[in-house]
């Protein structure tokens, strides 16, 4: 009898690979690279090919459409993915060239060393050891520090190319305004540029209006930017819990999330083997990884918040920084005086990190050690270029609690902490709510810009109603689209399992696609240059009944094709000038095309063709007796 291989054994075997679904190219898409000023700046994009259009005047070529690509090497057919070896260190040479870091002889965290020396963990450990780096004594290695010194790093050039999405090629190739025409947007005072330059990237980072999460110990990450004046980004949360999931599950969730468009991934693991899980994820992730270090610190004291200490938390920060975590959520704004403000709430403190620190504050009747040791935290962050994501530990967990005293008291504190972080040249973004009805969302954005000095805003939704468990990806996407339009730089996705359970791969995909819609809708509303090109291309394909192009240009080609084929599965149906909604005789687009073709044949305008058709129908009505209702 064959003994089934356990998930752990399967994951750590020599031929371990990500699941094949995550590395398949999307239909009619190919990975391309745009080279920068040096050979090792190769910016990945996804190019979607289109078929030709047959017109009465002949063949019209439709240009390929380039879109932002977060999938890393996983979608490159020329790359052999082996998760036991991780990804290639893309940024390693750039980091070495700056000559401001040093390779450590060993790990600095006592907990990391303890895990390394435990033989029981050998089977699950990521065994390819990467050298650990730290800033040389007295050096600051943050992208903000370089930016403020006037230095344009390779990361900044990479980002500028990436943000422009090669749209100049569409502008050059398009023979009309059909693809490049765009509605003017309302940006609410943002400084959105027609073209992103490396200098603009540098300036935005220097001013604190954007961050480049890029730990020097995560050289595998492809540079990206989070800021109000750039494309709206989305984050995907993954992570195990005490009730389930494995290392393999979480690595697969990560690769699945980035396939569908996750710009960053947060590992929120609270179950077993958090350290090992995170190592596997980081070594195989081409996108920035964020964490909430207090979660792991709590595990180290067996879940007893009152037993947490600064020393335990400090060691956890160093442990994770040396693994390569790119940004830390730190709930330093949860202060002792704010905790009583939550007593009037319907749902109290719903943030895990916020509740941990509130309990600690009450148990010791002291200010949080995250607040009192904030400058010490800054010293650690700038030695590895870990960005702050200042946590909203007092965010509202219900519509009832939206925009209350506790929430905005914390927001003001986060603004004060931002200035301290900037004094150390540490990149910083601010986390936001939460549960907020639509008419109160704008106030959140306005106050964040005011109190936090235009540091990037990173929000969870917000959810706009509390009545739809199982559909909170939708309730939150409504709020996410709105706050993204108002100026939020990154949206944290919500899956259908929110408030109900641990999301699986399908939930991750649903959350990603839903939030890609919200982010793109926000880009359109802001008038982000080039945001409408993909919409225009898909609309043109739809009008011309180029079904496969319509599927391929969509955010989820698989689902679009599946829905079409449920009623019209034949291959010939993908050439038909109708769908199953209206059928062949009532398709509005088909009727419009017939009018255009008739006008072209008769050498008259479309309006003249419509008037001529109306006159013929009027004559036909009179000829048949002029009766409104005729007997059949």
Swiss-Prot record:
Keyword Signal: no
Pathway field: Cofactor biosynthesis; thiamine diphosphate biosynthesis
Binding residue positions for substrate: 237, 266, 295, 331, 351-353, 392-395, 431, 458
Molecular function per GO: 4 iron, 4 sulfur cluster binding; carbon-carbon lyase activity; zinc ion binding
Record text on cofactor binding: Binds 1 [4Fe-4S] cluster per subunit. The cluster is coordinated with 3 cysteines and an exchangeable S-adenosyl-L-methionine.
EC supergroup of this enzyme: lyase
Keywords, ordered alphabetically: 4Fe-4S, Iron, Iron-sulfur, Lyase, Metal-binding, S-adenosyl-L-methionine, Thiamine biosynthesis, Zinc
Top-rank taxon: Bacteria
EC number: 4.1.99.17
Catalytic activity from the UniProt record: 5-amino-1-(5-phospho-beta-D-ribosyl)imidazole + S-adenosyl-L-methionine = 4-amino-2-methyl-5-(phosphooxymethyl)pyrimidine + CO + 5'-deoxyadenosine + formate + L-methionine + 3 H(+)
UniProt binding sites for Zn(2+): 435, 499
Keyword RNA-binding found: no
A Gene Ontology BP annotation from the UniProt entry: thiamine biosynthetic process
Cofactor: [4Fe-4S] cluster
Positions bound to [4Fe-4S] cluster: 579, 582, 587
Family (UniProt): Belongs to the ThiC family.
Subunit structure, as described in the record: Homodimer.
Function: Catalyzes the synthesis of the hydroxymethylpyrimidine phosphate (HMP-P) moiety of thiamine from aminoimidazole ribotide (AIR) in a radical S-adenosyl-L-methionine (SAM)-dependent reaction.
Descriptive protein name: Phosphomethylpyrimidine synthase
Record organism: Nitrosomonas eutropha (strain DSM 101675 / C91 / Nm57)
């Amino acid at each position: 009898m064959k003994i089934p291989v356990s998930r752990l054994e399967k994951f750590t075997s020599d031929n371990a690979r990500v699941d094949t679904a995550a590395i398949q190219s999307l239909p009619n898409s190919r990975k391309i690279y745009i080279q920068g000023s040096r050979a090792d700046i190769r910016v990945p994009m996804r190019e979607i090919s289109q078929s030709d259009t047959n017109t009465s005047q002949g063949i019209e070529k439709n240009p390929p459409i380039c879109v932002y690509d977060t999938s890393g090497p996983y979608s490159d057919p020329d790359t052999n993915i082996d998760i036991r070896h991780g990804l290639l260190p893309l940024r390693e040479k750039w980091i070495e060239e700056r000559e401001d870091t040093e390779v450590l002889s060993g790990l600095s965290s006592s907990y990391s060393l303890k895990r390394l020396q435990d033989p029981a963990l050998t089977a699950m450990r990521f065994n390819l050891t990467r050298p650990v780096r730290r800033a040389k004594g007295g050096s600051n290695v943050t992208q903000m520090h370089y930016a403020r010194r006037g230095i344009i790093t390779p990361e900044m050039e990479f980002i500028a190319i990436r943000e422009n999405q090669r749209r100049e090629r569409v502008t050059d190739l398009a023979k009309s305004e059909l693809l490049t025409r765009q509605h003017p947007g309302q940006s609410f005072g943002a400084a959105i540029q027609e073209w992103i330059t490396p200098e603009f990237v540098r300036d935005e980072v220097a001013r604190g209006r954007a961050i480049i999460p890029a730990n020097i110990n995560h050289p595998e990450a492809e540079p990206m930017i989070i800021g109000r004046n750039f494309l709206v980004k989305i984050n995907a949360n993954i992570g195990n819990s005490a009730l389930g999931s494995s290392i393999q599950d979480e690595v697969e969730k990560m690769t699945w999330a980035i396939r569908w468009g996750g710009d960053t991934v947060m590992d929120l693991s609270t179950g077993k083997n958090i350290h090992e899980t995170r190592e596997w994820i980081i070594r195989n992730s081409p996108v920035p990884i964020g964490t909430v270090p207090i979660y792991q610190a709590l595990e180290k004291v067996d879940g007893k918040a009152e037993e947490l200490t600064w020393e335990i938390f400090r060691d956890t920060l160093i442990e994770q920084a040396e693994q390569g975590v790119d940004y830390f959520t730190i709930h330093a704004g949860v202060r002792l005086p704010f905790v009583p403000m939550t007593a009037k709430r319907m749902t109290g403190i719903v943030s895990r990190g916020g509740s941990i620190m509130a309990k600690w504050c009450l148990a010791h009747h002291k200010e949080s050690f995250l607040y009192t040791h904030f400058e010490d935290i800054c010293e650690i962050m700038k030695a590895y270029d870990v960005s702050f994501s200042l946590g909203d530990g007092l965010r509202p967990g219900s519509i009832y609690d939206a925009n209350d005293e506790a929430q905005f008291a914390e927001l003001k504190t986060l603004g004060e902490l931002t200035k301290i972080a900037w004094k150390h040249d540490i990149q910083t973004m601010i986390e936001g709510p939460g549960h907020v009805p639509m008419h109160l969302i704008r106030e959140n954005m306005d106050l964040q810009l005011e109190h936090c000095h235009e540091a990037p805003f990173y929000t969870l939704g917000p959810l706009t109603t509390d009545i739809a468990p199982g559909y909170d990806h939708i309730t939150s996407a409504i709020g996410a689209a709105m706050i993204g339009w108002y100026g939020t730089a990154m949206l944290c996705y919500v899956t259908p399992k929110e408030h109900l359970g641990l999301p699986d791969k399908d939930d991750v995909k649903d959350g990603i696609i839903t939030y890609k819609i919200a982010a793109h809708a926000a880009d359109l509303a802001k008038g982000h240059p080039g945001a409408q090109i993909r919409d225009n291309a898909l609309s043109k394909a739809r009008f011309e009944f180029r079904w496969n192009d319509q599927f391929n240009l969509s955010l989820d080609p698989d689902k679009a094709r599946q829905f079409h084929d449920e009623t019209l599965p034949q291959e010939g149906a993908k050439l038909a000038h109708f769908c199953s909604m209206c059928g062949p005789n009532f398709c509005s687009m088909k009727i419009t095309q017939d009018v255009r073709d008739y006008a072209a044949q008769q050498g008259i305008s479309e309006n003249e063709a419509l008037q001529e058709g109306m006159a013929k129908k009027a004559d036909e009505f009179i000829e048949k007796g002029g009766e409104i209702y005729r007997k059949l």
